Amino acid sequence: MESLIRTWLEQNLGPVERLERQARWRPVWFADVVRDGRTLELCVRGDRTDYPGVFPLEHEMLVQSLMHERGVPVAGVHGWIDEPRAFVIDRVPGQPDFAGCTEAQRDAVMDDYLRILAELHALDVAPFEAAGVRRGGVAAYERWYRASKKRPDPFMEFCLGWLRRHPLDARGRESVVVWDSGQFHHDGQRVTAVLDLELAHIGDPLMDLAAFRMRDTIIGYGDFRRMYAKYEELSGRPVDAEAVAHHHFAFTLTNQLAFHAALADPPPGSDYMTNLQWCNETNLFAVEALADFLGVPLEAPELPAAAEPSAAAVPTRHLVESLRSGDYELRRLFRLARHLQRFDEIGRACVEADLDDLAVLLGRRPRTWQEGDAALEEFVVADDGAHDKDLVPLFHRRLWRAHQLMGPAGSAMTTHHRLQDVG
């Protein structure tokens, strides 16, 4: 694969000084190429391995090119590689978070980012549409989920049913959006480039004010009330808090919709634990959003005590310790081993607790978790919202247990981050 990339770079741009794959879940390479006596610092973005994306890779390149042509600070595009499917862009300077920054620096950067969003949202969508930029939203994710679904997924069916029963009126709002907002590099004062445009499309501009609420739990963007007021000032348009909340809920579903199939049947190269962590964390955000909509209090269930060590406890512990490493590939396996170790300790009891909850709801106790998932999905599809206030706490308990099975108690993998209150 790298030899094909090297050949394309040499034939189209110049001699390659360095080509190195980034250690991450998506195929990405960093390249240094000499052209006209200077070194081009490039990034080669490849296709996902675990799902094809709701928009094809060509769509990402198209939107990025159109934005760049209109002065939006995104990396310049150098071209498309047919094999492996990838496109070549500039590497951009700056840092992706606020480590080492003062509060004033962070706020200045965020004000600049909001300015960029406001200017993006003011662009005429007609040239983007004419060039082939799509409309989409969560419906694009649902289409992939329906086409690739491999097993019952009662929580997703519950959430999608809620969205169908409570459609959002965008009141004519439409613009080019990045959707997966909050991803950029900065120099401590200004944004140097907006990054990761794989979800960019034509949609409601308020999608961009909602999506990065989840990433805020990791990055820390500052006070959202202040930022929303700043966006209103910069754009001249009011921020509809109810619409933002609706878009936030819809965006919390995108991980599970995207990775349902990859978690049910992981393809080679899939980062199972990263996908599982993303899904478990954002599923909790989703059920918490529903609880806010419905005014339902949530309480995390008590976890069962660890069972007596099984026959697998010693070899599992040995496996975990053998995989403890900073190497990316070993780290993936280390996390998977710790998940299996924790399941060996309390997994069976968590499954039994889930089935006990279903017995109360259904009036009968399913025999297995598979039977339970199928019965619960059948119930929520037929229920059509009649028992939403009963189902939200039930799903919260199930999702909380699933989240806590990802690793040892208190580990980073089992830590659930709370969203900032923007009400």
Predicted regions and their residues:
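ATP-binding pocket architecture of kinase catalytic cores
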Residues: 18-134, 143-155
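C-terminal amphipathic alpha-helical interaction region
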Residues: 321, 325-331, 335, 342-423
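Active-site acidic catalytic loop and adjacent metal/ATP-binding pocket
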Residues: 24-33, 38-39, 43, 77, ...
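Active-site activation/catalytic loop segments of kinase-like enzymes and analogous catalytic loops
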Residues: 206-239, 249-295
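Short amphipathic alpha-helical segments and their helix-coil junctions
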Residues: 227-239, 309-324
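Charged, amphipathic alpha-helical linkers/stalks
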Residues: 291-317
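Short, surface-exposed acidic
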Residues: 15-19, 237-245, 369
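An alpha-helical support segment within catalytic cores of ATP-dependent transferases
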Residues: 2-12, 16, 125-189, 236-238
